[in-house]
Amino acid sequence: MNHISKINPKKELSQCFISSTHITDQIVNYAGNISDYSIIEIGPGLGTMTYSILNKNPKKLISIEKDRRLSTIHEKIVEEFQGKYEFILSDALNIDLRDIIEPPVKVIANLPYHIATTLLIKWMDYINFFTSFTLMFQKEVADRIVAQPNNKNYGTLSILIQLLSNVYKMEDFGPEIFSPQPKVMSSVINIIALPEPRFHVNYRKLSQVLKTTFSERRKMIRSTLKKLTNNADEMLESLNIDNNLRPENLSIEQFCQITNCIN
């Protein structure tokens, strides 16, 4: 199944194709059992991962692809796996996955890097619809998702995702597994949805608090919080949080406590 020479990857779609079924089989294996699940794949490209998923016999697989040039490849796979595989030619950013598939759902994808973070945050709005995500990201983004406090990579993305899920980095991959080769390392991560958020908080309000505080991550938390409240010092004292700490030193729970105290 070598279609690489026939399709010129589009840079504006972040197209980096994986041609090795050994690699895609490995990624799909990280998703665990899929025979009892419906699967979503975003950006299926040449279909290598698509075959790896279908060969593990999911209840159903739906792939969403924006590039019309790849339709012929996937129409053939639809014929080969009749009733099991559905191909949607569309922009994944414009689709609410709840409208096209029934749970339980796992997402397995080599995400287009230019929309990967936006997609993930969008899915967090209805994370209870999903069981898990097994996703390839640019390594720099994956490191931010799994980062813990007191780490330079820890920030808004880490907190918004980890509030709602358990995250695990599975493996790093070099550019050589892709065609064309990107200039960055890549990583596969597993995101396992929690039945409930770790802490009670207004998610959109938390997002705003994080955006404000981490926009000046080297400043002390008392300084950045003054943009959001008139009593930052008193609030931090009441929560027993050292006001000399920087945002990257605070736990998810502490950020939720702060958010809940801001009117």
Swiss-Prot record:
SMART domains: rADc (SM00650). GO terms for molecular function: 16S rRNA (adenine(1518)-N(6)/adenine(1519)-N(6))-dimethyltransferase activity; RNA binding. Disulfide bonds: none annotated. Its EC number is 2.1.1.182. It catalyses: adenosine(1518)/adenosine(1519) in 16S rRNA + 4 S-adenosyl-L-methionine = N(6)-dimethyladenosine(1518)/N(6)-dimethyladenosine(1519) in 16S rRNA + 4 S-adenosyl-L-homocysteine + 4 H(+). The keyword Transferase applies. S-adenosyl-L-methionine binds at I18, G43, E65, D91, N110. The keyword S-adenosyl-L-methionine applies. InterPro entries: KsgA/Erm, rRNA_Ade_diMease-like_C, rRNA_Ade_Mease_Trfase_CS, rRNA_Ade_methylase_Trfase_N, rRNA_adenine_dimethylase, SAM-dependent_MTases_sf. It is found in: Cytoplasm. One of its GO terms (cellular component) is cytosol. HAMAP family: 16SrRNA_methyltr_A. Specifically dimethylates two adjacent adenosines (A1518 and A1519) in the loop of a conserved hairpin near the 3'-end of 16S rRNA in the 30S particle. May play a critical role in biogenesis of 30S subunits. Belongs to the class I-like SAM-binding methyltransferase superfamily. rRNA adenine N(6)-methyltransferase family. RsmA subfamily. This is Ribosomal RNA small subunit methyltransferase A. It comes from Ehrlichia chaffeensis (strain ATCC CRL-10679 / Arkansas). The lineage of its organism: Bacteria, Pseudomonadati, Pseudomonadota, Alphaproteobacteria, Rickettsiales. The gene is rsmA.
